Amino acid sequence: MEASLLKKNQSIELTIEDLTHDGSGVGKIDGYPLFIPNTLPGEKVTAKIIKLNKNYGFARMENIETVSADRVEPPCAVYSKCGGCSLQHLSYDGQLEFKRNQVEETMKRIGKLNVEVPETLGMENPWRYRNKSQVPVGFVNGKLTAGFYQKRSHAIIDMSTCLIHNEQGDFAVQKTREILAKYGTEPYDEQTGKGDIRHIMTRFAHTTGQLMIVLVTTKERMPFKEEIVRELVEQLELTSIVQNINPHKTNVIFGDRTKTLWGKDIIEDTIHGIRFAISARSFYQVNPIQTEVLYQQAIDAAELTGEETVIDAYCGIGSISLCLAKKAKHVYGVEIVDQAIQDARANAELNELANTTFETGKAEEVIPAWYKAGIVADVLVVDPPRKGCDEKLLETILAMKPKKVVYVSCNPGTLARDMKILTDGGYVAKKVQPVDMFPMTTHIEAVTVLHLN
């Protein structure tokens, strides 16, 4: 069939050739690509066209004529509606291979790099891994509910469990929901801006078993607040109950004010033997098992002997910095979020690591200032946000010439782009190691080390 003859709502038969970065299947009609969610390579499907653009279109799978050997039955009852996961229909081995292929293809296409991409480091059990649940609250069929948003919408799906949240946090969300409903707590309405409760968040410390509940409310006063707190304490094994107040008409989750309603201000967890104090708003990796795997890759890549000066750009609460400080002469960390730097300093003190310096600011401004002041890194670690490293920071790296750059990435596209700039500037990379931090989703983390040639 010619692509020019395709029409909206038309049913067509085609074979899926590949998966996109967001996990949709891709099939072609006369060279014209159609993106079809919930399909896998090798599958012959019947699909209904829902949108046609000039160079590509979208279709909805109606029937699978030939089923992929990698297809599995998703165990989650709301998987087809929920926006939380996108790969439950693909076997876990298939997910790991998909992520490896994504990294390899991105390195070649964007970075023009021919590097080794080994098998993705996955989990023994890829379920129940998230130590943080962040669940919106709303009305569904006239009753208070807590669940995830539907795909491409802000409609909340009523759900009794989430299979990627750890059991303790998951149970705490459901119990909190029951108690709020019992006291007639009114959920926040995005349209009107009215209501009392916006989100229920839980944080669970994997190594200590400590559990925090955060109630995100529209105002400090909430009907029956004392009774709700008392019942939570009676019915759950908790370390902390915290209230965050967000009075703004926005879809941003947190407001600026946080107060402890019961118990401690923080919970405590460990990574590679380093203790971390985690507050309601601390940035902290959500998969504790794979964080150890990811950081071990970074530690191994740094090859520290105790004589090195290390700079950690985008250091957050110091999680990588402090793991490296055990083996370095001195570690300097920089982070734009001041609260994270305060947390990093507190965590350094908690672990009696005096060989650390943390400063608030933009990495691309602070590191050049350090360089001018004579602070030169032997090893420079970057763990940037999805947008990758700032251009000015990359220029500083090329001027400073650290022997090694250890790059921890949450976006293969910007990793490939930045690696190309560094390799063009005299660095050599041999391997990029994917790590599966978020099973059942398309997110990919990767670690590489670039050596000065």
Curated annotation (Swiss-Prot):
The keyword Iron-sulfur applies. The keyword Metal-binding applies. Residues 5-63 form the TRAM domain. [4Fe-4S] cluster binds at residues 76, 82, 85, 162. It holds the Pfam family tRNA_U5-meth_tr. S-adenosyl-L-methionine binds at residues 285, 314, 335, 383. The active site is at 410 (nucleophile). It is an enzyme of class 2 (transferase). InterPro entries: MeTrfase_TrmA_AS, MeTrfase_TrmA_CS, NA-bd_OB-fold, SAM-dependent_MTases_sf, TRAM_dom, U5_MeTrfase_fam. Keywords: 4Fe-4S, Iron, Iron-sulfur, Metal-binding, Methyltransferase, S-adenosyl-L-methionine, Transferase. One of its GO terms (biological process) is rRNA base methylation. GO terms for molecular function: 4 iron, 4 sulfur cluster binding; metal ion binding; rRNA (uridine-C5-)-methyltransferase activity. Its EC number is 2.1.1.-. PROSITE patterns: SAM_MT_RNA_M5U, TRAM, TRMA_1, TRMA_2. Belongs to the class I-like SAM-binding methyltransferase superfamily. RNA M5U methyltransferase family. This is Uncharacterized RNA methyltransferase LMOf2365_1776.
